Amino acid sequence: MMMSLEKIKKILPHRYPFLLVDRVLEVQKGKYCKALKNISGNEEVFQGHFPSQAVLPGVMIIEALAQTAGIVIHSGKEDTSSSEIVFFAGIDKAKFRIPVIPGDQLVLETSLINQRRNFWVFEGKARVDNKLAAQAEIKLMLQPL
């Protein structure tokens, strides 16, 4: 199931400049999500990282993966109108392989590894041109607002 930006905004609370998922290509309910983030030279982060050679900070890639995993969590919920929010709970095994620069398209994939009550663990991978740019184990928790 594909998702437009408008549908993503109904699921994720993030907004510009911190909404880091542009489109969802595929969702397997409660298990997996494949999404896109187009990297524009107009991203605010490039004003300081780095002005002479723009490189997307690794923390932004990790956040994009966490948002993609958040879509997985919400896709598995029966009641999407509840007042709960997904929070970042931890990160393990983060590795950054290649720089991500303006003009790149990040393909974000998150797969559920484990879930217990309101705590989820995902494997996340970000690719550019089919090359692994970053990977990490993402830990998220669902909490009431």
Language-model features: where?
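Hydrophobic beta-strand-centered segment that forms part of the acyl-chain substrate-binding groove
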Residues: 1-2, 69-107, 133-135, 141
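Catalytic strand-loop segment that frames the active site of acyl-thioester-processing enzymes
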Residues: 16-56, 61
